[in-house]
Every structure is written in structure tokens, then in C-alpha cells.
């Protein structure tokens, strides 16, 4: 691809990153207000975690189905952008309706289901769109640009949660939806500029099935470790040295490391390969999570959290690059959909810890500080086993 084409592809990745940012913001708004919404609809707040678990189940199933659908229609649909925009508008209408669905539990749950199903248009399809127009050597860099949006939203979520206290839910639901749809509109325009300048299709050999299976198994194990570390362990670790009010300023350190590490990682992927980089990141990240568990000063904890975030950032760039390369045989959708489904399953397991009563089990409490490191090191071993003579 020539330089102008590369610039247009980078612009498309930036637009997708912006879409991912605003999509992640809508999820934060949803989680913040869900207890209030279910209570207004006559549902006990104790059901909130199970509703979130159900959301993740829907995400996992629909993401895989959407991925296969994208692969099936890739030759019959010239541009994915308009389809993504149309489904996003439907998803946005369902999302805006949530604060008004207090007449009955059934209405609220139906609106949540519609939103959960249609929001799949904003996960794997934009990535498949990017893969359609990108040359293989640029995938790590473009993945980094896209993931930056998600990382920034994750870093901002504690501040957003504080800012939304006492705000009428109808306001953030409306504003977040409008900004998201506007961002998707920009994505449509960016895609239109690229259609006439797309790279020729690359006929790469499919990866060995065993390697693909081991990759997704490793990703699931590593994602479980990430969920245990960041969502279950990080706050208690910080509270050894800080107050609850400080958490909003301390938790984003992980995501700062994540974001900064992605940029050099995008270059390392091209030299080492995606799976070897994931394995190295998993091993280093496992040691970093142990450092978090046993840090005896606040500066040491902050440093270990930063390093853990950096390792997860490098692993994420490698994972998305690997999934995109696995799909370069015309099956980008299914591999990306499976990646998002794996991440949803890991989130599901983390959310279910508290309502299932597992968090109160003494044995689980004793093992929890060790779980992230164990999971990440196990993922590293799976990735070593998955490595083939050819780079992923």
C-alpha cells in the first residue's frame, strides 16, 4: 500500500478506536445506573449481578454468530459501515429507552436484551472492516490505534462513575448514545474513502487447528487472570496504602501502562510473532501480579500495577493481531467474534464470583492473590505449546 492509502487505513483505525471508546463509555453508564433502573422497574437489586452475567452470555453467543455472518456476506456487501450504523441506531434506541422502561420488569429486561444483542455490531464487525482494508504487516499498528480507545475508556471509567453521581440517568444515556452514533457515522465516511483503494486479497495458508485452539485456550486463561487481578485484587491491594476515595486516581495506573506499552509492542509483534510476544507478556505479567500481591510500599505497588498493565497491553496487541492473521483466509469475522466471546466469558466468570457466594469461601480468598499469576503463567505455557515453526 502507498503512503496515502496507509494514512487512510490509519484514519479508519482511529475512527474505530473512537467508536470503541464511546461504546465502552455506554457500558460504564449502563453498569453505574443498572441498580437504580432495576429497582424502579420492581426488580430486587440482588438480581443486578445475574443480569450482568446474562449480558455476557448474550455477548458471547451473538459475537460468534455475528462473526460467522460477516464472513458469509463479505462478498455480497460492498461496505460494512452502513450496516454497522443501521444496527447501531437500533441499539442506541434500545439503550436510550432503558431509563424509561420502569413500568414493568418485562419491558426493562426486553430493552436490555435488544441492546445486548444489537451491540454486537460494534465489536467484531468494525475489526473485520479494518482487516478487509489493511495489509497484513500493518495489523499490529492498526490494532494498537483501535485498542487505544478501549484503554482510554477503561482508564476514565472510575472518574466517570464519580461524575455521574446524582445525575438523572436519562441525560448520560442520551448523550453517550448520540456521541456513539456520531462516531459510527464518521466510521462510515472513513470506510467510503477506502473502498476504491483496498489492498488485494491475500491468500495465506490457514493456521494449524491445534495452534488456533491452544491460542484461544491461552487467551481465556489469561483473560481470567486479568479479571482476577484488576477487578478482584487491585482495589484491596491499593487499600493497604490508600483510602477508598483514592481508588479513582490509582486504578487507572494499570491502564496507563496498558496504553503506553501497546505502541512498542506493535513493533515487537512484527519481529517476534504474535504468539511468542503473548507468551513473554504472560510470563512477565504473571510476575508483575505477584509483585502487586506482595508489594510492601505504595510506590512498589504502583510500579507493579503499571508493569502488569503494560504486559496486558502487549498481550492484547498480540492477541488481536493473531486473530486477524488467523482470519486472513476470508474468515476474519469468526476469529474476531470468538476472541470477543472469550473475553466475555472471562468477564462472566468474574461477575459471577460475588453472587455465587464464591467470594465468601475461605479457600477461594486464600487462593485469590495467586490466581492471576497462576493463570498468566499457565497461559504462557499454552502459547509455547501452540507455537509452530511458522510465525503466527
Each predicted region: which residue ranges?
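Helix-to-loop junctions at the C-terminal end of transmembrane segments
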Residues: 62-78, 261-274
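Intracellular juxtamembrane helix-capping segments at the cytosolic ends
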Residues: 121-134, 314-328
Amino acid at each position: 500500500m502507498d503512503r496515502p492509502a496507509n494514512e487512510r487505513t490509519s484514519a479508519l483505525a482511529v475512527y474505530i478506536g473512537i467508536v470503541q471508546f464511546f461504546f465502552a463509555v455506554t457500558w460504564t453508564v449502563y453498569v453505574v445506573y443498572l441498580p437504580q433502573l432495576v429497582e424502579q422497574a420492581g426488580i430486587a437489586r440482588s438480581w443486578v449481578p445475574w443480569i450482568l452475567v446474562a449480558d455476557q452470555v448474550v455477548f458471547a453467543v451473538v459475537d460468534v454468530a455475528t462473526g460467522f455472518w460477516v464472513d458469509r456476506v463479505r462478498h455480497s456487501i460492498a461496505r460494512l459501515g452502513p450496516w454497522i450504523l443501521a444496527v447501531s441506531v437500533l441499539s442506541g434506541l434500545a439503550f436510550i429507552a432503558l431509563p424509561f422502561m420502569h413500568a414493568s420488569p418485562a419491558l426493562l429486561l426486553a430493552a436490555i436484551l435488544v441492546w445486548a444483542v444489537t451491540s454486537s455490531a460494534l465489536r467484531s464487525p468494525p475489526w473485520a472492516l479494518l482487516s478487509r482494508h489493511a495489509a497484513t504487516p500493518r495489523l499490529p499498528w492498526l490494532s494498537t490505534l483501535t485498542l487505544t480507545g478501549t484503554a482510554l475508556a477503561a482508564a476514565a471509567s472510575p472518574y466517570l462513575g464519580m461524575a455521574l453521581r446524582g445525575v438523572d440517568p436519562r441525560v448520560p444515556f442520551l448523550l453517550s448514545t448520540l456521541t456513539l452514533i456520531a462516531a459510527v457515522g464518521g466510521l462510515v465516511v472513513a470506510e467510503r474513502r477506502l473502498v476504491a483503494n483496498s489492498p488485494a486479497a491475500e491468500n495465506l495458508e490457514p493456521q494449524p487447528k491445534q495452534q488456533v485452539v491452544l491460542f484461544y485456550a491461552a487467551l481465556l486463561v489469561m483473560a481470567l487472570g486479568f479479571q482476577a487481578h484488576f477487578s478482584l485484587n487491585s482495589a484491596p491491594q491499593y487499600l493497604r496504602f490508600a483510602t477508598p476515595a483514592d481508588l479513582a486516581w490509582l486504578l487507572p495506573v494499570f491502564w496507563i501502562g496498558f496504553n503506553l506499552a501497546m505502541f512498542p509492542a506493535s513493533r515487537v509483534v512484527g519481529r517476534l510473532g504474535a504468539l511468542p510476544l503473548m507468551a513473554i507478556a504472560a510470563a512477565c505479567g504473571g510476575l508483575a501480579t505477584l509483585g502487586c500481591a506482595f508489594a510492601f510500599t505504595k510506590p512498589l505497588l504502583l510500579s507493579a500495577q503499571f508493569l502488569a498493565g503494560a504486559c496486558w497491553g502487549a498481550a492484547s496487541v498480540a492477541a488481536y493481531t493473531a486473530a486477524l492473521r488467523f482470519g486472513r483466509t476470508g474468515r476474519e469475522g469468526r476469529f474476531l467474534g470468538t476472541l470477543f466471546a472469550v473475553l466475555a466469558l472471562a468477564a462472566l466468570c468474574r461477575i459471577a464470583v460475588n453472587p455465587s457466594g464464591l467470594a465468601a469461601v475461605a479457600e477461594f480468598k486464600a487462593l485469590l492473590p495467586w490466581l492471576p499469576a497462576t493463570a498468566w503463567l499457565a497461559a504462557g505455557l499454552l502459547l509455547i505449546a501452540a507455537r509452530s515453526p511458522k510465525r503466527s
